[in-house]
Amino acid sequence: MHTNVRRFIKTGIAFLFVGLLIGAWMISRRELGGVWPGPYLVSAHAHAVQLGFVMFLILGVALWLFPKPPEGDARYRPERIDAAYWTLTIATAARIAGELARSAEGPDWLGWFVTAAGVAQVVGFAIYFWTMWPRIRPVGSHLREAKGQRF
């Protein structure tokens, strides 16, 4: 398993635990204190679990399992995957931190911070999928399908 794959998967697991801690905090306050979580806290929890954990695992496993890039492919370069990883990691962590700060009645400029982090997440995904696009191709499956095999 390559370094980039491990990095995506381990970062996803770290985001899972962040999401679980936020979830434990929310349920404790709701059940023991009667305080329902606000939308910013729910958003921080959702981004930690759904984007931070689920998407990072998907991206890491895709990087691991998809066919190698075609010979002479100029688009796929590990540096671009690194750029996507760091953009997504920093943006997702910033988004979660910003949402948590907003849930605590943080300053108004946090709205711009959260928005910028969200846009950076979109940029990170765009870099990843633009780089990976040539790797989404048949390698042998078109031959099996021609013989009548179905998946």
Model region roles, listed by residue range:
Residues 1-151:
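Hydrophobic alpha-helical transmembrane segments of multi-pass integral membrane proteins
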